[in-house]
Amino acid sequence: MLAQLGAKPDDPRLKAGVDYLLAKQCADGSWWGRWGVNYVYGTWSALAGLNGAGLDPDHPAIKRGADWLIAVQNPDGGWGEDCSSYKLDYKGYEPAPSTASQTAWALLGLMAAGQVDHPAVTRGVNWLKATQGPDGLWTQAHYTGGGFPRVFYLNYHGYPKFFPLWALARYRNLKTGNSRRVEYGL
């Protein structure tokens, strides 16, 4: 947000935010998430923030985050993560069937990392297009809202509608525009 409001890279508040995100990156390249389940959401959020702060897509943390998202892509081209990834004895990402919202988060993260031309992004976009309903929207059975982890999870009915549209629009804009970098609206 600070970058969107015009903060420069040397702004101490922006630097503190970047330093915090870099310090919180997990060894596997992911970030923990809070409002969405879980590491897919957190990794998208962190990559969007680092991109917004002006870090180069070749920065090691951004590359590790993008590599992690690519590594956890489901064979069908989408992404999914089970709520059990919030368990206390964390052992790693918990895969689940692909969902529209988690696929969109992964795509938004990869695009923020400068990976719009990566084949994983194409596969994810194709998954969203193939699973889009006749009304132009998506449904999903799995909970993807964080709620209070390990206590209850939320089914935000807007998640599988808003986020896929955002990801597809961003993909189209990056592929047809003059820039491969996400510059506005994180």
Stretches with model-predicted labels:
Residues 1-19, 23-179, 184-186:
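An alpha-helical repeat/solenoid feature that recognizes helix-turn-helix modules
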